[in-house]
């Protein structure tokens, strides 16, 4: 049982819902690292974002999250579970809200405000705990990794200053290429 979908459905991705993004801002925060700094022949991700372009250089980030991020998040979990030969179930995977999220509340410091309200209705005498982000041990795991060595990567790429999650992305890409020996 996984609950990744609750962040998507109920507004727990407050860092991605923090503002009405321009195209460039959203691409930068979503991609987090520029492939041109690490790959010899990077492929532009621009066409993926272009499908969500709005007037005045804005992006329909809510639709992007619903279409792209949702698939990305669920398939990552589904793959891990299938490799471990375990059943995968996320009760929120197909859940859609009848009304749009109140972005002002989320931006005002109330991520998952609907869940909190339902909790308070069901358990009126209990205090609502603060949201605690899922711990990410990648900084520790990837601390000593020296970086990719395949020819597809720019060898002068210095990964020492990168956060663990970005090292992990490079590591996974290199492992993928090793598996299929492209």
Predicted feature locations:
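N-terminal glycine-rich phosphate-binding loop for ADP-containing cofactors
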Residues: 49-53, 146
């Amino acid at each position: 049982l996984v609950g990744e979908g609750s962040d998507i459905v109920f507004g727990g991705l407050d860092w991605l819902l923090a503002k009405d993004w321009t195209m460039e801002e959203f691409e930068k925060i979503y991609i987090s690292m520029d492939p041109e700094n690490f790959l010899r022949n990077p492929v532009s991700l621009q066409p993926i974002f272009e499908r969500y372009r709005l007037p005045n250089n804005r992006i329909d980030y809510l639709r992007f999250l619903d279409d792209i991020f949702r698939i990305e998040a669920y398939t990552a979990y589904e793959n891990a579970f299938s490799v471990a030969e375990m059943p995968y179930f996320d009760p929120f995977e197909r859940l859609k809200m009848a009304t749009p999220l109140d972005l002002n509340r989320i931006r005002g410091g109330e991520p998952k405000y609907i869940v909190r309200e339902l909790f308070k209705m069901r358990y009126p005498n209990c205090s609502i705990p603060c949201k605690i982000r899922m711990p990410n041990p990648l900084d520790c795991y990837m601390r000593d990794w020296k970086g990719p060595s395949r020819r597809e990567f720019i060898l002068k790429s210095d990964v020492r200053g990168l956060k663990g999650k970005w090292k992990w992305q490079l590591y996974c890409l290199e492992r993928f290429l090793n598996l299929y020996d492209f």
